[in-house]
Amino acid sequence: MQFFSLKTRIVLGEGSLSYIKSVAKKHSRVLIFSSKSMRVHGFLNETMNYVEDANAEVEAITGVPAEPSYEYVESIMPKVREFQPDLIVALGGGSVIDVAKAVKVFYDAPELKFEEVAFISRFEKPKPIPKLKTPLIAIPSTSGAGSEVSAASVLKKGDIKYNLVSFEIAPEFAILDPRLPRTMPKEVARNSGLDVLVHGIEAYTTTAATPFSDAMAIKAIKLVYKWLPLSVQGDEKARENVHYAATMAGIAFLNARLGLCHSLSHKAAWIAPHGLLNAIFLPYVMEFNMRSEYARKRYAEIARELGFNTAQELIEVIREFNEMLGVPKLSELVSEEEFLSKLDEMSEKAYHDPLINFNPVEPSIEEIKELYKRAFYD
């Protein structure tokens, strides 16, 4: 028996940010989490004006860190509780949305302890998150994470990245206004777009994929393959298409999950941005997965959708795509000494990553170590 679910209502199109006024009319106290860039580009002000037009009180917390942590969430909880919002809005990239999701958990269920509900290993079983009442609107400004529809939040505590996973934290609404991703710098557009491509390919090849998640994954892959090079150059239509592809891929992995490539990049997060690491590791993970007949079949299906024939061709196409977009080698991002000093720790942690459970081939710690080394020395 399989399931396909989507909790989030999606609103899209030029100027769709104004929809927030319709939602805010049903609420009295609206708390907005915003990235600095959304404040600078005027979108925070626009959002606050829509809320005020709906006769709701509004408060904003800006400057959410790029690497969200539980310590940061803990530091802002007194302000959140003092304001007592009945609607939470996340305006920014995946980090902002992840913070808003975590705030929703500990605001609605203050009795919960972080360590009870967050987890780092597939061999742990966290306490389920109870029913939460405060609705969340996600308004992504970058086109990659898929956090606007996903049921997960990734937060650091100390140096360790934890996962919060529950349908309770999936946003009630996602507003996809293509004006927002037009503000992305080229490098952010590239890295986040590459993340979408990996989301699509991994969601299509997990052991939990369904015909419904497949449809979203394939459409996202095709859109990114066609439009990302133009998006990096700032083309407005391309930015819009990649923005929608990010959410489609998010719907795909919400249901089908992800795989080994993400496990590797999560534990190497100290080296470079997440999307860039995913792009670097992807061809090596695909080669590793080729021992599975199921994975070979699925890669070949993706290849045919892009106008090629075989799984092996797809791997070469991915390498060429990376090269065209200027994706560096892993060895250009970190010194050999530093890489080797953390290799054992990264490999051990990646082996425990929950997403390994959905990869078409289960790797050993030694095989994970070899994949890291191949990516570095190739």
Curated annotation (Swiss-Prot):
Fe cation binds at residues 195, 199, 262, 274. The keyword Hydrolase does not apply. This is Alcohol dehydrogenase. Its EC number is 1.1.1.1. Keywords: Iron, Manganese, Metal-binding, NAD, Oxidoreductase. Optimum pH is 8.5 for oxidation and 7.0 for reduction. Optimum temperature is 75 degrees Celsius for both ethanol oxidation and acetaldehyde reduction. It catalyses: a primary alcohol + NAD(+) = an aldehyde + NADH + H(+); butan-1-ol + NAD(+) = butanal + NADH + H(+); hexan-1-ol + NAD(+) = hexanal + NADH + H(+); ethanol + NAD(+) = acetaldehyde + NADH + H(+). Changing residue 199 to A: Disrupts the overall structure of the enzyme. Retains 10% of ethanol oxidation and acetaldehyde reduction activities. SUPFAM superfamilies: Dehydroquinate synthase-like.
